Amino acid sequence: MGGGGQQTDRITDTNGRFSSYTWEEVQKHTKHGDQWVVVERKVYNVSQWVKRHPGGLRILGHYAGEDATEAFTAFHPNLQLVRKYLKPLLIGELEASEPSQDRQKNAALVEDFRALRERLEAEGCFKTQPLFFALHLGHILLLEAIAFMMVWYFGTGWINTLIVAVILATAQSQAGWLQHDFGHLSVFKTSGMNHLVHKFVIGHLKGASAGWWNHRHFQHHAKPNIFKKDPDVNMLNAFVVGNVQPVEYGVKKIKHLPYNHQHKYFFFIGPPLLIPVYFQFQIFHNMISHGMWVDLLWCISYYVRYFLCYTQFYGVFWAIILFNFVRFMESHWFVWVTQMSHIPMNIDYEKNQDWLSMQLVATCNIEQSAFNDWFSGHLNFQIEHHLFPTVPRHNYWRAAPRVRALCEKYGVKYQEKTLYGAFADIIRSLEKSGELWLDAYLNK
């Protein structure tokens, strides 16, 4: 009854109609190889489809046994096309007596959120301004060209090299925000064009893998700040985060590092090492182990371009040093911006909340300004981005007042901070988590 997930596994009654299920029955199918999801009251067996899912293997599993309607709508800009892929997986629908929402979720809130999405669509918030993204790509290419020309004209002296490194790090950081736009399918009308340009930006301009990014990032969006589902809160035992994990580690006497000092050693092993060490290794390991040869070719094209440009001036050794110094600076930029909206927020195990509530407890916004928009790639509107990941980032500000009003209506906390305050909260939250760990380690 739970296996397969192909068209031949459909379950029908004697009249050839699809079966009806209760939520209790659906919630039994959550294990690997036996996974059902509900979308728009229809029940789908995705047990085998997870292996072919373009969004990654795990993201569907994270919603097994649940209503995935909001996630389904949020991630897919072309719903009609995606529904065609779902048809062979259909095995039934919820019984008429069953609510549309599972696990006692607030039906009125869910319906109001869906109405908000429809209103934003009607107001054109999901429509792209091509010039916006063309200018962003143009300024990245311009920065790359300026860096090369500075070495060409002014040589390899220390001061000039430092300026060149800052320019290259800026280009890399901005390319990181731009690939994020294409990865979320928020630029072109077709997924194919978004995927193609995504591979160009993340592969050729950054030397990373689109497949690796998709696998990690979509899980993060689907279940933000949820242990065992969001890879961004898997700290590899280097840190304990939130209020739950530190106590668990403390009670179990787990001490891989002195976590009560993590707010101090964060400066040495967090921002400096994430991209140049951990991501660098993980990206290549992922591409090779999973046979992502197209991604690997795009990635290699970046390294060929970089070393052709800079070994002629610096030689191989110093070109490698420059490369890693650029990665080192980019890593600081990336970590502070991406973590300011998540690490200080609630981090816990699955609580089966509705889409709006789940995203709002895990994200916060940063005050809008021209600098903050550019510096963070508009991730200062993290709340709106998480609720509507396919909305082009130049329209987040239009959605923000509507989202805030909906949150106020239902008593959902909508947090907005200053940039400096958000940075400081990262350290404060790490310190608090470390103190919770130490107390549990010594006294429980």
Curated annotation (Swiss-Prot):
The chain crosses the membrane at residues 131-151, 158-178, 265-285, 306-326. GO terms for cellular component: endoplasmic reticulum membrane. InterPro entries: Cyt_B5-like_heme/steroid-bd, Cyt_B5-like_heme/steroid_sf, FA_desaturase_dom, Fatty_acid_desaturase. Pathway: Lipid metabolism; polyunsaturated fatty acid biosynthesis. GO terms for molecular function: acyl-CoA (8-3)-desaturase activity; acyl-CoA 6-desaturase activity; oxidoreductase activity, acting on paired donors, with oxidation of a pair of donors resulting in the reduction of molecular oxygen to two molecules of water. Its main location: endoplasmic reticulum. It is a multi-pass membrane protein. A motif (Histidine box-2) lies at residues 217-221. It is found in: Endoplasmic reticulum membrane. A motif (Histidine box-1) lies at residues 180-184. This is Acyl-CoA 6-desaturase.
